[in-house]
Design a protein with these regions (language model features):
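Divalent metal-coordination and catalytic microenvironments
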Residues: 2, 50, 79, 114, ...
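Active-site microenvironment of metallo-dependent hydrolases
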Residues: 203-302
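His/Asp/Glu-enriched, well-ordered alpha-helical/loop segment
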Residues: 104-107, 111, 151-236, 250-254
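Long hydrophobic segments that form regular secondary structure
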Residues: 120-132, 138-144
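Metal-coordinating catalytic core of metallo-dependent amide/deamination hydrolases
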Residues: 1-118
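Short, acidic/turn-prone active-site loops that include or flank metal/cofactor-
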Residues: 14-17, 82, 139-143, 167-169
Length: 302
């Protein structure tokens, strides 16, 4: 679907022990097969990672199986120290903190993304830095789950490649940008921090992370880079210049201001209308599939 719609996608399937060994093995195989398929097809718009849920739902045996199935072909995507239960489980059952445990299994590396990392200590931060592993902060999700705040300022000072995500809590990255800034300032009790980190994470580091998986330079307007452009319908009420554009993006613009979207040179959304996409058909399919899923999970009809 992502290919048909013209989206650039790096995907994986979440491995977990929660549903028993059979489902776990199927999830591992799904990742392995998808990685093989991506390597075979060499589609410049589609890439694969190896997905894992979180350390408290993945045993050492399962980690070993994941690493064997991956065979060094790609990086991993996993939630780490999102809540203290992840830390407690790791220490109680394995005698290691989460990041140490990932290092023991060879999960870390320059193409691996650790989501959240709220409760990592300084020793774990050093390991993340030494291995070149990436971290993605999801401020709204963390606040919604009331699990804490990622130590972004400390991670940033260590030179860790730190990106901004949503954990599917929202689809508006500019909304996340605003929330990130105010929660980091609130947490630090300092009204002058987080500005540079916010802009760097969203507009520079996210592109750097994606570039590790796609053989194109992303996130810049220059010859040879991917032609990814959005046009914003934004009317400023104060002077707008290259000196204060960051402030306008933080405090003025919203996702709904997007008027046109171009991905890899293809116009997908023009003047607030999708191009070559039957929105009603997709919405109907999504509703039907969600009803099937909810019915299966909740044992009732919708």
């Amino acid at each position: 679907e992502s290919k048909r719609l013209g989206l650039r996608s790096c995907l994986c399937y979440e491995v977990s022990d929660r549903d028993g060994e059979e489902k776990c093995l199927q999830a591992i195989q799904e990742n392995a097969d998808f990685i093989t398929e991506c390597q075979k097809n060499q589609d410049p718009m589609l890439a694969a990672m190896f997905g894992g849920h979180a350390l408290f739902t993945i045993s050492d045996k399962t980690f070993d199986r994941m690493v064997a199935a991956n065979n060094g072909r790609t990086g991993y995507h996993i939630h780490v120290s999102e809540g203290m239960n992840d830390v407690y489980d790791s220490l109680q059952n394995y005698g290691r903190r989460p990041v140490q445990r990932l290092q023991d299994h060879g999960i870390l590396g320059p193409k691996t993304i650790l989501g959240h990392c709220i409760h990592v200590n300084t020793a774990e931060m050093d390991i993340i830095k030494e291995t070149g592993t990436m971290v993605v902060n999801n401020p709204e999700s963390n606040m919604g789950n009331a699990i804490g705040i990622c130590p972004v300022l400390q991670l940033h000072k260590r030179g860790i490649l730190l990106g901004m995500g949503t954990d599917a809590y929202t689809h508006d990255m500019l909304e996340s940008l605003k929330v990130f800034l105010i929660i980091q300032r609130h947490n630090a009790a300092m009204p002058n921090v987080g500005w540079c980190e916010a802009m760097t994470m969203l507009f520079e580091n996210n592109a750097k992370m994606a570039s590790k998986y796609f053989d194109r330079k992303l996130g810049v307007l220059e010859a040879g880079a991917a032609a990814d452009v959005i046009v914003m319908d934004y009317k400023p009420f104060t002077p707008l210049s290259e000196e204060n554009i960051d402030g306008h993006m933080l405090f003025g613009m919203m996702g709904k201001n997007c008027r046109t979207t171009i991905i890899n040179g293809r116009v997908l959304y023009k003047d607030r209308e999708f191009v070559g996409i039957d929105e009603d058909k997709i919405n109907a399919w999504t509703m039907a599939e969600s009803k099937k899923l909810w019915s299966t999970l909740n044992d009732r009809a919708y």
